[in-house]
Amino acid sequence: MDQVVYHTDFPGLNLLKRGKVRDVYDFGDRLLIVATDRLSAFDVVMPDPIPGKGEILTQISLFWFDQVKDIVRNHLISSDVNDYPEACRPYAETLAGRSMLVTKTEPLAIECVVRGYLSGSGWKSYQKDRTVCGISLPDGLRESDRLPEPIFTPSTKAEAGQHDINISFDEAANIAGRETTEKARDLSLAIYRRGVEVADARGIIIADTKFEFGFVDGELILIDEVLTPDSSRFWPRDGYAPGGPQQSFDKQYVRDYLLSLNWNQKPPAPDLPPDVVANTRKKYSEALDLLVG
């Protein structure tokens, strides 16, 4: 993990888009997804990379794709650069460990969020009216409490610089169709439950997470990243103490730093001090070590 990659520039390859973290190249019915070391918080991309982050995210996603392959098909074709199109070969050193060749899909127009614990925007919503995305929850819950059952709380999809908006199931169904939204909900809950089981055995609580799905030949399959510190809240099981914020293995550390500043959560983002960068990288590395070994 010596090479820091903030953004990629591969002459001869067709850059389809730059997301908040990933650069995506188009190969017809396939895509090359490259996880850079960019970090986003509050839907804004930070100016400072987290060294090695793209490789960590990729290895964790590959781990989970394998762990849940009996639940849902995924878009992965290969993460071995030797299997990539010939045009990728000059960039093999940059691509190795931080990229995937995947099947192109028609992405689902909603984000599929599952919450097993009360934290973040879910906690804020609960404090207002005891609901999260239109789902009523019991009285008396504290911040970071485990919910009686995991809940599906979809959101809109935001472009870089915009904010995702939490929506109800019915609102999601109006966007994506009811049958599709029900399928996405059922898959999301099944993947989350499997993830919780696997992570718990390794000392990690997955408090909440976000999945993305896409259609290929009429089938809804799992795409993008899966149960990573970017898409999830990872808490150490040891030391879990509901009633307040938890220690974490994810970018909450960066969020907390940014909340200590007088920043309006709109671009441009402030610079991250070296210690925040180093500690964030350490937390991501700890998550990888615990999960994958």
From Swiss-Prot:
Segments forming a coiled coil: none
Gene3D superfamilies (UniProt xref): ATP-grasp fold, B domain (3.30.470.20), Phosphorylase Kinase, domain 1 (3.30.200.20)
One GO cellular component term: cytoplasm
Highest taxon, organism lineage: Bacteria
Record PROSITE patterns: SAICAR_SYNTHETASE_2 (PS01058)
GO biological-process terms attached to the record: 'de novo' IMP biosynthetic process
Enzyme class: ligase
Span of the signal peptide: none
Phosphoprotein recorded as keyword: no
This protein's UniProt keywords: ATP-binding, Ligase, Nucleotide-binding, Purine biosynthesis
Reactions mediated catalytically: 5-amino-1-(5-phospho-D-ribosyl)imidazole-4-carboxylate + L-aspartate + ATP = (2S)-2-[5-amino-1-(5-phospho-beta-D-ribosyl)imidazole-4-carboxamido]succinate + ADP + phosphate + 2 H(+)
GO MF term (any one): phosphoribosylaminoimidazolesuccinocarboxamide synthase activity
EC number: 6.3.2.6
Pathway recorded for this protein: Purine metabolism; IMP biosynthesis via de novo pathway; 5-amino-1-(5-phospho-D-ribosyl)imidazole-4-carboxamide from 5-amino-1-(5-phospho-D-ribosyl)imidazole-4-carboxylate: step 1/2
PANTHER family according to UniProt: PHOSPHORIBOSYLAMINOIMIDAZOLE-SUCCINOCARBOXAMIDE SYNTHASE
Assigned protein family: Belongs to the SAICAR synthetase family.
Protein name per UniProt: Phosphoribosylaminoimidazole-succinocarboxamide synthase
Species of origin: Desulfosudis oleivorans (strain DSM 6200 / JCM 39069 / Hxd3)
